[in-house]
Each structure stands twice: as C-alpha cells, then as structure tokens.
C-alpha cells in the first residue's frame, strides 16, 4: 500500500508496522510505502511546515505532480488558513520526516518513494499518473479503476557473459535480444487472474530486463566490489544491456507493430 505524505492519516499509516501498541491497528504482513512529492522535501530542507489534508477536500492532488501539484497544494493551504477547508493538520516537515525515518529503521516500513521523479521520467505520462510502484519498487506504471499494472520481468545472468577477462558483447547482445522477445511473448500467453491486469498488460506491453550475478561477474574479472572499477563496470554492463534491449524492442516493433498506447509516449 502506498500513501501520499499529505494525507491526513499518514501518521497512523506510519505506525502500521510497529511491534507495539494496539494490534488491531497494525498490519505486520503488509508492505507499505510513502509516496513523497518534491515539495515536501523542499519544505523539509527549508525547515518549513507541512499540511495534511483529507483527500475528499483535495481531490486533484492524487493525480497531479511537479509544478502543478505545488501550485494546487499551496492553494489548498490558503483555503485551510481562511477556513474554507475544515479538516486539516499542520505539522513541522522535519518532525514528519523524522517519524518516517524512525519507522523505517524500526520496522523496515514504510519505504521512501518519490512521486515527482517517477512521473516526470515516465515514458507513459500521456496516459495517466503513476500512483505507486510494486513490492520491490523497480517498476512504475499507470494504474486506474480499469487497469492493474503488470510488468513481466527477467534477468540476464551476467557472469555467463564474461569471457577472457571482459564482457562478451556479441553473446550479451544475443541473450538480451532473445530475452526481450521472450518477455514480449509472455504478455500474450500469460495467465491473468483479473481482467484489469490483462487489459493493462496487453494495452501497454511493459517488460523489464535486469541482471543477476553482478558480484560473481566482478569476481571473475578480479574486481573488488567496493571500488571505482566496480562502479564503472556497473555503468558499462547496464549501458550495454539497455542499448541492446532498446534495439531489440525497436526490431519487435517493426515486426509486430507498436503497442496500443505508443503514440504520445
């Protein structure tokens, strides 16, 4: 569950994973995360206050981000000051941030995730707002009442592509190209427990390709994990995977056509 940090219930939300207190108000087995706008971090940096609202009083905030969010949020704060909005609470941004970090250290939850960067960098911004991520926070896709975001994931076994002290680029290209085609095929043959998931997956066709065995690859290369060389190798290896993945995706688009919501992305 993700909750924006302007929500009036955010302080209780932070306590959901605590090991003390009324167990009826705890969710020990649920993963939780904070969805934080840049404006909160700006207020925190300046030592300013932060206002919590009931979502029924500020319906637009959920679906906007960036400058538009900042403008609307400050408008709602002015309405709260003049009494037009009755249900709100003003807190010190640093106090809320301190509680966020305290709960994170104590329970591992809620995670800290950032709303504005996820939306600003989303290639699918033309079809809606990203409201959350997944369990491991590695995908950021649009969700709404008709669509439940689904992303088919795979990994390249990096140490299997180390040959004679370097990355075997041609072998890596072959593996990535095969993996991209495989993941795209999964979209069509997958089992979907609910129609909203199938609708989303086939409409946007999102896939994710990463790597595994990074430390093993470093070992084969004789590179220390805690070194500048390791950082450079991480950049180089992922740059290659990204390039070949995009190249393979373009080839698939030529062969099968673009996905339904490609235009405008």
Regions found by a protein language model. Give the residues of each.
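Active-site cavity-forming subdomains of large catalytic enzyme subunits
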Residues: 1-169, 192-199, 245-264
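Contiguous, well-ordered alpha-helical segments that form the cores/surfaces of helical PPI scaffolds
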Residues: 12, 155, 184, 205-220
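Short glycine/threonine-rich loop-to-helix capping motif typified by GTGT followed
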Residues: 15, 126-127, 206-213, 241-244
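Electropositive phosphate-/nucleotide-binding environments in soluble metabolic enzymes
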Residues: 34, 90, 94, 173, ...
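Short coil-to-beta-strand
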Residues: 148-154, 178-181, 212
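Structural helix-adjacent loops and short alpha-helical linkers that scaffold large soluble proteins
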Residues: 164-173, 222-226
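Internal maturation/activation junctions in enzymes
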Residues: 175-198, 202, 206, 224-265
């Amino acid at each position: 569950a993700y909750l924006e940090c302007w929500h009036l219930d955010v302080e209780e939300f932070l306590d959901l994973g605590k090991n003390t207190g009324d167990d009826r108000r705890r969710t020990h087995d649920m993963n939780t995360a904070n969805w934080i706008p840049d404006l909160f971090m700006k207020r925190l940096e300046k030592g300013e206050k932060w206002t919590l609202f009931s979502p029924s009083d500020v319906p637009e905030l959920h679906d906007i981000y960036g400058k538009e969010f900042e403008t609307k949020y400050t408008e709602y704060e002015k309405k709260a000051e003049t009494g037009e909005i009755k249900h709100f609470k003003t807190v010190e941004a640093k106090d809320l941030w301190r509680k966020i970090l305290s709960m994170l250290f104590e329970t591992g939850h809620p995670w800290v995730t950032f709303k504005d960067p996820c939306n600003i960098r989303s290639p699918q911004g033309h079809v809606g707002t990203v409201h959350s991520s997944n369990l491991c926070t590695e995908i950021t896709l649009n969700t709404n009442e008709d669509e439940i975001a689904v992303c088919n994931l795979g990994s390249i076994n990096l140490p299997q592509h180390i040959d004679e002290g370097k990355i075997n680029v041609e072998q890596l290209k072959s593996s990535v190209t095969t993996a991209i085609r495989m993941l795209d095929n999964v979209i069509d043959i997958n089992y979907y427990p609910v129609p909203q998931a199938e609708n989303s997956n086939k409409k946007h066709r999102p896939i994710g390709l990463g790597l595994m065995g990074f430390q093993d690859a470093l070992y084969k290369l004789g590179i220390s994990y805690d070194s500048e060389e390791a950082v450079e190798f991480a950049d180089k290896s992922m740059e290659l995977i990204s390039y070949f993945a995009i190249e393979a995706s373009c080839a698939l688009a030529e062969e099968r056509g673009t996905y339904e919501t490609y235009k405008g992305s």
